């Protein structure tokens, strides 16, 4: 009994609830009940743990603290855990491998690093933060692995196989907002800035193009006004080439 009591207090300390060990469940908040449930699951030291959105009722800072604790427990005890969440950062931070599911089917199973850099298709790309997905076709194959590709509306850019690997005749290019840079010179994808928002370290621009609304980031030193015509240049470090598939010309809401 003493060992069980000791183990229970240890788990309550891990979830930050030891000071409320004697409080009745009816006197606990939703977030506190969630942490108690987590402690109950951990205290029996199971070889396999199943978590279904265990941190959903916690505030942002506590969520970060708790996922660190869960990861430490996994690694210390060599436990296997299946963890269900819609939070990308949460999934990546505690996992050795992540499965992305669509309509009940696994569409990609990989390490967090591979998922983040090389999504298998447009669905996975959107889940891991590629907000801009554009169909393209190759119009010219140049020297040194470079290709000229054209987007809807006629904008053309040069891509390199050194950055993307083999580039198909038709495909999708997916970019994160930091992968598109506004350029007043008009190079890249032709757009008009529809909305500018200040994020602190950068400005975010919602740019209207023939292919729909694209989200880009720009320096705070040289902001552009709404209504400005700009070209968007593509940074391959924050972009990926995907297999061609039919997608909506407008961003999902």
Annotated model-derived regions:
Residues 1-123:
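ABC ATPase nucleotide-binding domains
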Residues 111-144:
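ABC transporter nucleotide-binding domain
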